[in-house]
Amino acid sequence: MIRTGRRLCLLGDANSVHLRRWAQQMIDRDWSVSVVTARPQAIDGVEQRVLEPVRRSADWLWRVGAARRHVASLAPDIVHAHYVSSYGYLAARCDRRPCVMTAWGSDLLVTPRQSRAMHWLTGWTLRRADLITGDSSELVELASAYAPSVPARLVHWGADTDRFAPTPWRDKPGFQIASLRSWEPNYHIDTLLEAFAQLPCSRLAPPATLHLLGGGAGEVALRRQAQALGIADRVCFHGRLDDAGMIRVLASCKVAVSVPASDATSVALLESMACGLAVVASALPANRAWLGEDPALMPSPGDAAALARALRRLCDDDALAQRLGAENRARVLRDGRRATQMDAMAALYEELLEKAGPRR
C-alpha cells in the first residue's frame, strides 16, 4: 500500500552530492523530505534544519539536543541517518522510529578500528536502528556482525544511466584517463600520478592525458608532484565538477582509475562504468564484486608499479579496453541503475511503515 503525505527526515551532510541525490529521488517518489545537517547547502523542495558546525568528532556529542528538537519538530514518519559514526549516533539518540541507518564505508571499515570506544559505540548505534543499509556486501556483513538482530540490506547509490552513458569509442582522442576520486590520502592520487608518469608517452599521438576530478585538500602537493615528475602539461586538475562537467570529461576518456585504500561501492566507479570506460581499481572486495577478479587490473593500494602496468596494458590493447568498457556498461545497467536502487529503498521504507503501524 502506498501512503500519501509521507515525511522523511534525512540526517546527513546537505552539501554531499550523494545525500542531495537521495533527497531528490525520494521527492520524485512523493515523499516530503527534510534534512537535519551540520553542513548545510540548499536543496530544492527540502526543509533544512541546521546544527552548529562540527569541527572534530567529539562535537557530535554536543549536537544531540538540537538534533532531538529538530526531529521532534519535523515529526517525520521515518528518520534516515547517513553515516553511522556521526549522524547515525544522533539518530540513535533522537529515539524516533522507524529509524534507518546507511553506512557509507569508512564509518564501518575504518572508524570502529580506531579505538575500543569507537568499536563499542558503533555497535550501540547500529543496534538502535530498525534497518541498516550499505552499498557493498562487506558493509552489510559488518553491520550484521555489530547488530545481528537488525535487518541489513544491500542498497547501492546507483548511477544515473540515462545521463552517464557511453560516447562512441572512435570519438575518444588518444589515451585519456579519468579519476573522479577526492584528492585525499585514502584515494592515492599521488600513486596515480607516479604510475601515469611511467607510461611511454613518446610513442603516443596525441600524448596520454590524465584528468583529475574530485578536488580536495591535497591539491597543492599533487600539483607539485606532477611538476616534479615532468607531467604537469599532461595532467588536468579539474577539481569538483557537477554531473554535466563530469560527463563531459568522461566522454573523452577510455579508462577510469579508482585505487583507494578503503572503500565500499563507489558512485564514481559506477558512473565510470556507466559511461563505458574500462576501469582499473584497487583490489578491494567492493571493487571485485563489480569488476571481477583480474589481478592485472586490480593493483594493491599504493603500488604505483602495478598500477602503471595495468594502465600500460590498456594503452597497448585498445580492443581490450573497449570490450571491458562495454561489459562495464552492461553490468551497471543490470545491477547499478539509480532508479532501480531507489525504488528498492522506497519499498523498504514502505515495509517499515507497514510494520510500525499508525503513529499515535
Regions inferred by a protein language model and the residue ranges of each:
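Short hydrophobic beta-strand element within catalytic cores of glycosyltransferases
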Residues: 278-281
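Conserved acidic donor-binding segment of nucleotide-sugar-dependent glycosyltransferases
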Residues: 293-305, 313-318
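Short acidic/histidine- and often glycine-rich active-site loop of Leloir-type glycosyltransferases
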Residues: 101, 284-298
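Carbohydrate-associated surface elements
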Residues: 138, 158
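Aromatic "clamp/platform" in nucleotide-sugar-dependent glycosyltransferases that forms part
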Residues: 261
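Conserved donor-binding/catalytic core segment of Leloir-type glycosyltransferases
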Residues: 170-197, 211
